[in-house]
Swiss-Prot record:
The lineage of its organism: Bacteria, Bacillati, Cyanobacteriota, Cyanophyceae, Synechococcales. This is Tryptophan synthase alpha chain. Belongs to the TrpA family. InterPro entries: Aldolase_TIM, RibuloseP-bd_barrel, Trp_synthase_alpha_AS, Trp_synthase_suA. One of its GO terms (biological process) is L-tryptophan biosynthetic process. The active site is at residues 49, 60.
Length: 264
């Protein structure tokens, strides 16, 4: 069993919901990102999504877009992100999932890209702009390497499409809670409970809910609705960006612990 699936299997046996925080690599700097990964692992993260800064992030809201812009302005590239993973992954228990748009994969070539991220210690991959219809090559190549490609289900997806995505997704299924981009919201999308119930009819794979979860109370609600994982991005990135890097890391640790407590 590969790392992401194994993590969920262990959590299910204990009756626990996974916490998956997201960070943008290189914001505010690479050293702080490395330390943030260690802190999140220590503070209760079960898996960690690490975003590769990209100049045209279609799925990202203003907080993560701004973080990506800051990282790009400092010259952060894929190889820098992988250097962080290589440095940190053996020190932490949480598997690292790389979040990247498809263009860097296309530019390097699927096999070269996957070989590089596997060698660095990445365990999973999320590609938000990869259509289901074009996912087979990447799914086959990740499976060959013991990596897991996590596919996204949109709230607007038909039941037939939800079924098709869930069948192909590796590790877990990423359920997008709202239409639109990522970002901090005051309440979780009202359709999430029904979406989760619908997904449960078509798959027994773990389901993670993301986009818009920003408060412990929201995380607790999503768990109560039956999610196997809560994914928190913009609210994490926002806290890390506030104040000095030291202050940001302290805020990140506190927030991560609060979220983990809420879903435990």
């Amino acid at each position: 069993m590969n790392a992401v699936a194994a993590c969920f299997n262990a959590l299910r046996q204990r009756g626990e919901c996974a916490l998956i925080p997201f960070l943008t690599a290189g914001d505010p700097d690479l050293a702080t990102t490395a330390e943030a990964l260690r802190i999140l692992d220590r503070a209760g993260a079960d898996l960690i999504e690490l975003g590769v800064p990209y100049s045209d992030p279609l799925a990202d809201g203003p907080v993560i877009q701004a973080a990506a812009t800051r990282a790009l302005q400092k010259g952060v590239k894929l190889d820098d992100v992988l250097a962080i993973v290589r440095e940190v992954h053996q020190d932490i228990a949480a598997p690292i999932i790389l979040f990247t748009y498809y263009n860097p994969i296309f530019y390097q070539g699927v096999e070269v890209f996957l070989d590089k991220i596997k060698a660095a210690g990445v365990k999973g991959l999320v590609v938000p702009d990869l259509p289901l219809e074009e996912s087979d090559r990447l799914l086959e190549a990740t499976a060959e390497r013991g990596l897991e490609l996590i596919l996204l289900v949109a709230p607007t997806s038909s039941p037939e499409r939800q079924t098709a995505i869930a069948k192909k997704s590796q590790g877990f299924v990423y359920l997008v809670s709202v239409t639109g981009v990522t970002g901090v919201r005051t309440e979780v999308g009202s359709r999430v409970e029904a979406l989760l119930a619908g997904m449960r009819q078509v798959t027994d794979k773990p389901i993670g809910v993301g986009f818009g979860i920003s408060q412990p109370e929201q995380a607790e609600q999503v768990k109560a609705w039956g999610a196997d994982a809560v994914i928190v991005g913009s609210a994490m990135v926002k806290r890390l960006a506030e104040g000095t890097p030291t202050e940001g890391l302290q805020a990140l640790e506190t927030f991560c612990r609060e979220l983990k407590t809420a879903i435990s």
